[in-house]
Regions:
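Extracellular "complement/coagulation-type" protease architecture
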Residues: 1-263
């Protein structure tokens, strides 16, 4: 049975970024991204296979992560890295179990969501560098006044061959479902589009499985609204990134339950 999690952590979605030291290098990763400050996105982690970046993921609790199902089309032995920005503190953890959504389609990328259980919980000493993101209830809506940011260690363009050492962030806007379908056609209710018309800010290779986090006006908590899923290339005009819509999946109902270990 699946372990039940609770997303109602009092600390979820509240990053505690450390003061910025010096100026930004101006490196642009993710597409059109800028360097994050250490502790700014404490739920973002990277997944590595054979020493190389494989995908991103988000922290849900001390021993569970959420990512994209397409990252695990072949179950692999994965290591998890939590990388901070400037000081580059690294914590490595092993994945014990991968739970891919039972309806995931490798052809359409529908239900592109997976849960990862760590072999050992995060040590409390890592706080505040490691904190959970909040999961949205099914009634949660995002408006134009929300701030939405995609983060990751992926490439800056389709041709790029060098990964950044600093976590990148890029602010994007959510498109209506009608506009999303105009761009791609085969868009299910479990998907959403986000980006900018010029394509100047987007996710790219290596960002898959990572978070699209949105914050309500007034500096409230950050919620995991989307998971980087697919798109037509990276940073192309009028072709936004496509994300798994977290609120439209029954995994959310499981994750919002009272914490209960059923192993």
């Amino acid at each position: 049975q699946l372990t039940y999690l609770c997303s109602a952590f009092s600390a979820c979605g509240h990053p505690s970024p450390l003061p910025r030291v010096g100026s930004s290098t101006g490196f642009e990763r993710i597409v059109g991204g800028v360097n994050s400050v250490e502790g700014e996105w404490p739920w973002q982690v990277s997944l590595h296979f054979s020493g190389s970046l494989y995908c991103g993921a988000s922290v849900l609790s001390s021993d569970w992560l959420i990512s994209a199902a397409h990252c695990f089309s072949k179950q692999r032995s994965l290591l998890l890295h939590s990388n901070s920005s400037f000081i580059y503190v690294k914590y490595v953890a092993e994945i014990q179990r991968i739970v891919v959504h039972e309806y995931y389609s490798a052809q359409t990328f529908d239900y592109d969501i997976a849960l990862l259980q760590l072999k050992k919980p995060w040590p409390p000493s890592l706080s505040p560098l490691v904190q959970p993101v909040c999961l949205p209830p099914t009634s949660h809506t995002v408006t134009d006044s929300h701030r939405c940011v995609v983060t990751g260690w992926g490439y800056r363009s389709e041709e790029d061959k060098v990964l950044p050492s600093v976590l990148q962030k890029a602010e994007v806007s959510l498109l209506s479902q009608t506009e999303c379908k105009k761009r791609y056609g085969l868009i299910s209710p479990r998907m959403l589009c986000a980006g900018v018309p010029s394509g100047a800010r987007d996710a790219c290779r290596g960002d898959s499985g990572g978070p699209l986090s949105c914050q309500a006006p007034g500096g409230g908590r950050w919620f995991l609204i989307g998971i980087v899923s697919w798109g037509s290339g990276c940073g192309r005009p009028n072709l936004p990134g496509v994300y798994t819509r977290v609120t439209n999946l029954f995994f959310t109902d499981l994750l919002l339950c009272t914490h209960k270990n059923n192993n």
